[in-house]
From Swiss-Prot:
Span of domain RNase III: 6-135
Compartments where found: Cytoplasm
A Gene Ontology cellular-component term: cytoplasm
Function: Digests double-stranded RNA. Involved in the processing of primary rRNA transcript to yield the immediate precursors to the large and small rRNAs (23S and 16S). Processes some mRNAs, and tRNAs when they are encoded in the rRNA operon. Processes pre-crRNA and tracrRNA of type II CRISPR loci if present in the organism.
Gene name for this UniProt entry: rnc
Catalytic reaction list: Endonucleolytic cleavage to 5'-phosphomonoester
Source organism: Enterococcus faecalis (strain ATCC 700802 / V583)
Alphabetized NCBIfam families for the sequence: RNaseIII
Domain of life: Bacteria
Gene Ontology BP terms: mRNA processing; regulation of gene expression; rRNA processing; tRNA processing
Protein name: Ribonuclease 3
């Protein structure tokens, strides 16, 4: 196994594998195995299968606890954005995993080292190997270091509704109280328009309207997001 990889994992993430064969397998692409059959190596596809499940469980639990007001559909949409191919490929590159993957000559020549699908699989395979080597706690710690800060910084906030986005932005500024107040209703019963104000610590920060109370609150939150520095 590349000593530089083991050194980087230890220095950046405090990870030291007990079974380095698992680490080597995680970074071994099937194309390399096919070109080096005499070495009797195993590729990373089975580890990828396991890592996919580990990642989904840990991310799901984090989103469930962090966003108690989000419905199932919103949580599912956000999780999908986090674990999709291009996101995981980006995480793999940020971890410098692309520098260490073992590829066959043909795969290397065709640009496999920068291919999103390959890097996504590599990231999941690494998680699978880490889980087998050190159980779920180590895998969770790694994801906490690599992925959770991006969630906290709002990298996937476009997957949330405006009220949740506003809550995230304001909570980063400290302990705040957010309140929505319905101030009036206009129009006939079959075509009402609702007007809502949103307050932060008692200060008005947004005014919205909509054909339901929920839509009026969403509009108020959206307007507040546009008016406050982030």
């Amino acid at each position: 196994m590349d000593n530089q990889l083991t050194t980087e994992l230890k220095e950046r993430y405090g990870i030291v594998f007990h079974d380095v064969n698992l680490l080597e397998q995680a970074f071994t692409h099937s194309s390399y195995v096919n070109e080096h059959r005499y070495l009797k190596l195993s590729d990373n596809e089975r580890l990828e299968f396991l890592g996919d499940a580990v990642l989904e469980l840990i991310v799901s639990q984090y989103l469930y606890l962090k966003f108690p007001e989000l419905p199932e559909g919103k949580l599912t949409k956000m999780r999908a954005a986090i674990v999709r191919e291009d996101s995981l490929a980006k995480f793999a590159k940020e971890c410098h995993f692309d520098n260490y993957i073992l590829l066959g000559k043909g795969e290397e020549a065709s640009g496999g080292r920068t291919r999103a699908s390959l890097l996504c699989d590599l990231f999941e395979a690494f998680l699978g190997a880490l889980y087998l080597d050190q159980k779920v706690g180590a895998a969770k710690k790694f994801i906490e270091d690599v992925i959770f800060p991006k969630i906290d910084a709002g990298a996937f906030s476009h997957e949330m509704d405006h009220k949740t986005q506003l809550q995230e932005v304001l909570q980063r500024k400290g302990d705040v109280s957010i309140e929505y107040r319905l101030i009036k209703e206009e129009g006939p019963a079959h075509d009402r328009t609702f007007f809502t104000e949103v307050y932060m610590n008692g200060e008005l920060i947004g005014l919205g309207q909509g054909k339901s109370k929920k839509l009026a609150e969403q509009d108020a939150a959206e307007r507040a997001l546009k008016s406050i520095p982030q």
